[in-house]
Amino acid sequence: MLKYYSGDIFTSDADIICHQVNCQGVFGRGIAGQIKKMFPEVEKTYRIITKQWQEQSGGITSGLLGRVSAQPVELNGRWFLIANLYGQDNYGKNGVYTDYKALSQAVNEIRDFVDVRGKLEKVAFPYRIGCGNAGGDWDKVEDILNSCFWDYQGEVQIWKNDSE
């Protein structure tokens, strides 16, 4: 079951903070922009991953769709993971870039990860993940999250920033 919060997702007590990224190595709008400022090492690693993938695949970036890369970060003495969910191949303005199948695969990968770890971890997602700059439909994305975590015993947090 999803639990909704209002405020800054980075004030949460989540063990994992998830956000959607594209497969092109462009990281800077939406919550990714906040992450870039707060945790520049996450953006650096993301760029390395996408560049290596592009080089190894002959420029075919869509192979990253549905995958996840995660990195531990520290904020005010608290460690947690930032998880990049590769839920869109491209980016731009005025279009739908979210690939629902890919986002679903990535969310399921997060679910598998927390299940394997065997702890009742808290997993946080920004409200309307994949729906702002990526143009997705929140009803569809919310259905993906609900179907993936319907029986999860830990907490799944949805954070709506006060400015939204």
Protein language model regions, located:
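Macrodomain-like recognition of ADP-ribose-binding/processing modules
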Residues: 1-164
